[in-house]
């Protein structure tokens, strides 16, 4: 049965319309037509305009009547979101918005991965979008200059990393030039005149990043902050942003240390199953030398991901989850970038672009270990991000556009994905000791993130008691707690230093999901059904974790 939209739903829908107008990237992400030729504007003026519109809708949401329980949850979620975003703006952090993964320096390029490329019209739009890159870069530089004027700048380490990133994009064989030169409308060639325009636009976008590179190497590097830590006050804001919940930061740090020790002990026990008496490192060596667990090309990786994903959907549907037909298509993709990141992008509103799992393979890497990555497919796909996000988009019967398309909390989303990994182990999908060790390897990394992130940004003492956390200590600590290449570990630690509060949201989010499930189970007593809990929780959409608790437990 479809719920009749309330007055609050209409306000929420109008806010999504305004968000799509203010952010063409958001419009592209959700499949909203009409702005695929535009780019987000990261200039100070655009940021202030976005804040002003946000405040208008904040007031409208606050004044809107509440018709039912769905409205109660919507109102709680939207008010929390508006209030926090205004606090973050007032803190001034937007003037120093530069990190290695989520800032405009990456976002201006990243949206091209999701832009339609299947028609002449799509490439006409992409030509205009690429030609907009220099203007977007200019606006972004002006925003960062405000931070320089205020003496509030990103850490030097983040600037240095972005110099390397910008060098790659600004090179003659950088992303935009290669993207333009390979342009096709699906399998069809484009008209010569359009092709020439596309190549010229690729050059223009490349020149835009050359200007950003010049700024990074000059004024930005000269004025960069020598201090990596964001500090307790701002960290508390970022923690709330990524969790949608207020937590005791010091208690969570101590819990993180305990959780890291617990997962490590569990790893040691599984290592003994793989080879009696083996250390974790020795068990990993056994797995890495097992030819049956090897993939030898990007093509093999893509096909393996797709098979594993399709099998999970088939086995889970109708047994542990009810997976609607549009959700049963998940495309596993090799990304056009080489950062090493594995990520998920949700479907468009009409599912014309399905949910996609992306693997960004570093240059020179052509061998992959299935024991390590089986759990990753479940994390990004089903029952992880794809089931969660695509179900949210699908639930038109109950949720307004904001709840379906725009509401997101890392603690909810990443916490669910880690919860889903453990669930797959509980359901028998990771009974193979190698695959289970891979899951624990990921869980250990996420627990280590809690300790490192809080330790660095709160200025905690090093675990050995010698001074406070710094980059070299963090790099060594992370290297000892993950079984990944030095290049990957280096990227990850740079990420944590520049994106405070995000990395711990995975494990902390999992913790809160499990706490909510256990409280829900206690409340239901003998009537508790885990399948019903998952369905009820996922049908709510991605809420901040405090709001999720309110929605499920009252």
Regions found by a protein language model. Name each.
Residues 1-554:
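N-terminal maturation segment of proteins
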């Amino acid at each position: 049965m479809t719920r009749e939209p309330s007055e609050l739903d209409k306000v929420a829908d109008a806010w999504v319309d305004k968000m799509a107008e203010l952010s063409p990237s958001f419009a592209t992400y959700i499949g909203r037509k009409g702005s695929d030729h535009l780019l987000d504007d990261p200039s100070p003026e655009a940021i202030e305009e976005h804040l002003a519109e946000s405040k208008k809708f904040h007031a409208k949401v606050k004044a809107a009547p509440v018709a039912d329980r769905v409205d109660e949850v919507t109102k709680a979620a939207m008010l929390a979101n508006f209030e926090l975003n205004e606090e973050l703006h007032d803190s001034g952090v937007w003037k120093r918005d530069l990190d290695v993964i989520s800032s405009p320096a990456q976002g201006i390029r990243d949206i091209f991965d999701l832009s339609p490329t299947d028609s002449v019209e799509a490439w006409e739009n992409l030509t205009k979008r690429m030609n907009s890159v220099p203007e977007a870069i200019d606006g972004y530089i002006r925003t960062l200059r405000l931070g320089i004027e205020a003496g509030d700048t990103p850490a030097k380490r983040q600037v240095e990393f972005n110099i390397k990133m910008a060098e790659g994009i600004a090179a003659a064989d950088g992303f935009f030039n290669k993207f333009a030169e390979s342009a096709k409308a699906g399998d069809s060639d484009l008209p010569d005149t359009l092709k020439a325009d596309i190549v010229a636009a690729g050059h223009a976008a490349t020149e835009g990043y050359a200007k950003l590179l010049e700024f990074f190497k000059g004024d930005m590097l000269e004025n960069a902050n020598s201090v990596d830590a964001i500090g307790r006050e701002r960290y508390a804001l970022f923690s709330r942003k990524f969790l949608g919940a207020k937590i005791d930061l010091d208690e969570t740090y101590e819990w993180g240390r305990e959780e890291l020790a617990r997962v490590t002990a569990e790893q040691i026990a599984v290592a003994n199953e793989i080879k009696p008496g083996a250390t974790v490192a020795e068990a990993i060596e056994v797995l890495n030398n097992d030819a049956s667990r090897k993939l030898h090309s990007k093509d093999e990786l893509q096909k393996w991901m797709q098979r594993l994903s399709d099998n999970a959907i088939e086995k889970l549907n109708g047994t542990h989850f009810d997976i609607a037909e549009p959700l049963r298509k998940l495309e596993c993709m090799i990304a056009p970038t080489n950062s090493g990141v594995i990520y998920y992008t949700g479907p468009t509103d009409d599912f014309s672009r399905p949910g996609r799992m992306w693997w960004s393979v570093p240059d020179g890497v052509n061998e992959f270990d299935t024991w390590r990555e089986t759990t990753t497919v479940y994390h990004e796909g089903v029952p992880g991000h794809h089931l969660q996000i695509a179900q949210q988009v699908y639930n038109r019967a109950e949720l307004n556009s904001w709840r379906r398309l725009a509401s997101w909390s890392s603690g909810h989303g990443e916490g669910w994905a880690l919860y889903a990994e453990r669930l797959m182990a509980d359901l028998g999908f990771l009974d193979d000791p190698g695959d289970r060790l891979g899951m624990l390897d990921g869980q250990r990394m996420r627990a280590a993130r809690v300790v490192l992130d809080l330790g660095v940004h709160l200025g905690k003492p090093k675990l050995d008691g010698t001074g406070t956390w710094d980059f070299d200590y963090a790099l060594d600590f992370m290297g000892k707690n993950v079984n990944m290449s030095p290049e990957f570990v280096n990227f990850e630690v740079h990420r944590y230093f520049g994106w405070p509060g995000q990395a711990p949201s995975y494990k902390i989010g999992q913790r809160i999901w499990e706490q909510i499930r256990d409280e829900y189970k206690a409340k239901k007593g003998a009537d508790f059904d885990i399948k019903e809990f998952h369905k009820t929780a996922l049908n709510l959409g991605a809420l901040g974790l405090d709001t999720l608790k309110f929605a499920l437990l009252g």
